[in-house]
Amino acid sequence: MSASTSTSTAASQDACYISLLGLAEYFRTSQPPNIKKCIQCLQALFTFMPPSKVEARTHLQMGQILMAYTKNIDLARQHLEKAWSISEPLPNFDVKFDTASLLAQLHLQTDKNSHQAKAMLRRAVELSQNNVYWHCKLLLQLAQIHASDREYSLASELLAVGAESADEASATYLKVLFLLSRAMILMIERKTNDVLALLNSAGQIIDNNIPNPHQKEYLKVFFLVLQVCYYLALGQVKTVKPSLKQLQMSIQTIMAPNWPSDEAIFGANQLEMFVWLPKEQLYVLVYLVTVSHSMMAGYMDKAQKYTEKALTQIEKLKQQEDKPILSVFKVILLEHIVMCRMVMGNRELAIREIAAARDVCMAAPQRTLLRRHSAQLHCLIGLYSMSTNLFEHAERQFVVCVSETSERDLKLFANLNLAIIYLRTKRDTDLKQILDAVSTENTHTYSSQALMGGFYYVQGLHAFHKNSFHEAKRFLRETLKMANAEDLNRLTSCSLVLLSHVFLSIGNSKESMNMVTPAMQLASKIPDIHVQLWGSAILKDLHRMSKDVQHEKDAYANHVKYSENLIADQRKCVQSAHHELVNWFQGDPPVTSGPPATPVLLMPESSVTSSVPVIASTSAAMQPAGQYGQFY
């Protein structure tokens, strides 16, 4: 065959490839897409015995189409594995990296564990060292899988490598993404000093070395979300306010109508084609951290308002594209709002929303969300059981929560509520054992102001029940000092009302009145029906002692009103189909039917509150996810 004939044949083949690829793309983008004909066009390419690179790329495209548009996962896997085997030995050929990334995703969807996905990505990371874009993208993907498997040290190491690679390539924007992603992992590990150092380093780079104002604003939002979560994890509700305000202003800037699209901001340079979250999801996330702050600060009405807005936004985004991260956001929001409902005495709504959270978890593929949130659901059901006086059920729920979780804050929160159950059921040996264990394990290792304040409160409650009033005052003053320093209003109101009861018990009516008055003012502002119930009983006794008949009648009327509200709500609870969830202790939660939760509300004893008076997020450490850096 002459050279001219050979060249002509090659040109003819190239024309066929281009025609078939063009036709395949035409069928794929038709309305509606004609995927069958698209696949037939790609399949026809193989009959021309194409060169290795064309063959590998076509197998990759077949795999992509099959994964995106069909349920034929096995055939998709075959094409991707063929693409990998052809492309792996070929130098300077990016198809191998795209294929490895997709194959890893497929393994995660179909395999029982992530071993094969990790092995595939490790090999691709090794091969991609001369291609900064793919090296960094694959490092992020591998780090995400390790983080999902709670292998945080490995995830952190990979992100550190990514930051170095980006730095060597002078990709400053990408370097900051790696630094902030690593800070997020270290936050989950509770390495607070390391988190602070990384945030400070990233913050300086954002301020001084990011020339593009739009990228700068995105990085600022990521940075501020982490900073807010950092302070909230420490229970520093007052300290966080300036950062939260700055975050809310930044997100308004990004959501403004004249703000460019994500594609326009990140599409020009390959090393800037990375975003943590698209702006619509960032918007939901800012609502979420605002809900968390409002709840911890004791502003239940605000928390409810922001939850409604966030859930509405989530539903809008789900209609456009149902991304898994939206379900994560929804579950965390529901977990927060459930606790708000219980503080306000709306337990029937709370159990409906627990059922809604269960439904979201059960709908996620391979029960991944249920595995991550099972302990939190047990904790919430424990709180619900406590509030409806089902102490045996509550105890079992908290024990399951403690056994299932590796989150130290959640474990402490559940244990403190167990201590209150043992106190109320007069199980002194169990109470002493759990308080000693909590004290030994947490006194020097816990840095959350809110939870440590809750620990001192429980000790004060214990001392009060032992009639050790001097000891009770000592613990409660410590609680008040911590609560007042950070505007933890619910902890303050609960401590004040208990301190008032202590003074009432020792006959100091003046000090008792000085404590119960601000307690009731705060409880009304929150609103906390349990503190209002307790405080109204104390006020009734104080007015009786001072022979103030009218005020005694008013206090008694308020006490009856709060009691009747709680008793009426209790009746609704026991009649609810979702009440059956109190009997879920293992495996998948039972399916219950009842009216759905809509984002909108018999504890007549007056001597103790229904649960630990610190609103601690029962969610795992805030682990928001992103397009190339999903950690949750």
From Swiss-Prot:
Protein name as it appears in the record: MAU2 chromatid cohesion factor homolog
One GO term describing the cellular component: SMC loading complex
Record bears the keyword Disulfide bond: no
Keywords carried by this UniProt record: Cell cycle, Cell division, Chromosome partition, Mitosis, Nucleus, Repeat, TPR repeat
PANTHER family registered for this protein in UniProt: MAU2 CHROMATID COHESION FACTOR HOMOLOG
GO BP, sorted A to Z: cell division; chromosome segregation; maintenance of mitotic sister chromatid cohesion
UniProt key word Nucleus: yes
Subcellular location: Nucleus, Nucleoplasm
Function: Required for association of the cohesin complex with chromatin during interphase. Plays a role in sister chromatid cohesion and normal progression through prometaphase.
TPR repeats: 453-486, 493-526
UniProt source species: Drosophila yakuba
Complexes and interactors: Interacts with Nipped-B to form the cohesin loading complex.
Family of this protein: Belongs to the SCC4/mau-2 family.
InterPro entries with a match to the protein in the record: MAU2 (IPR019440), TPR-like_helical_dom_sf (IPR011990)
Broad class of the protein's primary localization: nucleus
